Amino acid sequence: MNKTFDNGAVASTSYRNSKNYDSNWISAGYAVWFLREAKFLNQARLTLNTSCAVSGTGFFVSAKIIERNGGWKWHLLTEDIEFSANSILEGERISYTPTAVLYDEQPVTFRDSWNQRFRWAKGFYQVFWHYGARLAKGIATNPKAAASPATICS
C-alpha cells in the first residue's frame, strides 16, 4: 500500500481474504466472493485504468481527501460503497493493491451471514438513491470515468 501511495494514489483497496475460510461452507463462500471481487472486479479495473471500489476493510484514503471533505463525510449504512461512488463522481480514482492482503474473519452461521447480507442490501439501496442518478449521468457523458451503481456495488 505504501508503494501505491508513493506512486500518487489518493485511495486504494487491498485483496480482502477470509481468515476462517476453512470453518464451514458459509465462511468459504465469503472467501470465494472476495476472490471474485479482487480478480474479476478490482484487478480488471486496475488493468483498464478505471476506478476500483472500496469494500469493507483493508483500504487507505489520503489525508488530502479527508481534509478536502472536512473529515469522513460518508455515513450511509455501506459507507465503503458510498465513498467509492462519491470518489468516482468527484473524479478521484481508487486504486487496487493486489499484493496487500487483509484477512477478515467472516460469519460462520447462516443467521449472521443473512443479517450481514441484508444490511449490505439496504446499504446498496441507500447508495443507489443518493448517487444512482448522478452515476448514470456520468456513464452517458464519460463512460471511462464513471461506473454504474450495479458495477460499483458488486
Predicted regions and their residues:
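Long helical/loop segments within the catalytic core of UDP-sugar-dependent glycosyltransferases
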Residues: 2-76, 114, 118, 125-129
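Nucleotide-sugar donor-binding loop of glycosyltransferases
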Residues: 15, 80, 98
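Catalytic donor-sugar/metal-binding loop of nucleotide-sugar-dependent glycosyltransferases
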Residues: 49, 75, 84-102
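Structural beta-strand/beta-sheet cores of well-ordered domains, especially the beta-sheet scaffolds
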Residues: 57, 90-92, 111
